[in-house]
């Protein structure tokens, strides 16, 4: 039975970032996604608009190769374009001049920061990108030290058009005592909107969607697990618009 999971953050397109290194590795990652019950998969290669040129032609060609492979294998796996944007001071200018790569040509962008980013810089990034008309899915929010400040993430969500993504690896292994408490609080209070694999390979950073789903279901209930994997709720509605 297919679980019908959404994986909105993955680095399977080979030859463009620190994800898949070869076509063979990309195919192995697609095999793993299908085996994990993923049916909607986003190709969110790293990009830093304003800082460096993104290899768009290579990305598009290799993404199409991935689609060909999925069709040949008969996978119920739809692949969509996207990017994981690194916030930097030039990002707003890049957005104004040429636009930003979005998730499946919607108004949503997946954006990350450096782990040590300050609360001020994090909010500046949200303000700038939202001010250009984008909705922002903040990648792996558990990484940012400034969000250890209790209640800050909730305030930012109330102020800006953002959603929060957490990695499956964090669901499965939250870390130390205080990190674990924060992760559990966010999940329990509904601060996290969606989980994703952030997969880069099939070894050290694999998919693990099914395993994370089962843990969420055991710890927080099926309704929460379904919402966080795009089987129900806002991200299922998002999928239905694509």
PLM segments and residue spans:
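Mid-to-C-terminal alpha-helical segments outside catalytic/metal-binding sites
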Residues: 209-242
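Extended substrate/RNA-proximal surfaces in nucleic-acid metabolism proteins
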Residues: 52-165
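Active-site mouth loops of central-metabolism enzymes
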Residues: 12-23, 109-117, 171
């Amino acid at each position: 039975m297919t679980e019908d999971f959404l994986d909105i953050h993955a680095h399977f397109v080979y030859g463009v970032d620190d994800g898949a290194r070869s076509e063979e590795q990309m195919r192995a990652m697609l095999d793993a996604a299908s085996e994990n019950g993923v049916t909607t998969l986003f190709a969110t290669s790293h990009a830093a608009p304003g800082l460096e040129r993104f290899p768009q032609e290579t990305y598009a060609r290799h993404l199409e190769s991935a689609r060909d492979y999925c069709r040949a294998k008969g996978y119920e796996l739809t692949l969509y374009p996207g990017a994981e944007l690194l916030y930097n001071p030039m990002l707003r200018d890049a957005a104004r001049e040429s636009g930003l790569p979005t998730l499946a040509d919607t108004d949503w962008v997946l954006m990350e920061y450096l782990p040590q980013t300050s609360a001020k810089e994090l909010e500046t990034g949200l303000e700038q990108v939202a001010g250009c008309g984008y909705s922002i899915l903040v990648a792996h929010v558990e990484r940012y030290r400034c969000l250890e400040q209790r209640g800050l993430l909730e305030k930012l969500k109330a102020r800006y058009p953002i959603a929060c993504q957490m990695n499956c690896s964090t669901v499965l292994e939250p870390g130390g005592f205080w990190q674990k408490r924060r992760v559990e609080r966010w999940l329990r209070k509904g601060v996290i909107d969606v989980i994703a694999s952030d997969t880069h390979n099939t070894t050290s950073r694999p998919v693990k969607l099914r395993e994370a789903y089962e843990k969420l279901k055991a710890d927080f209930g099926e309704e929460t697990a379904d919402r966080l994997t795009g089987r129900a709720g806002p991200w299922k509605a998002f999928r239905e618009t694509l």
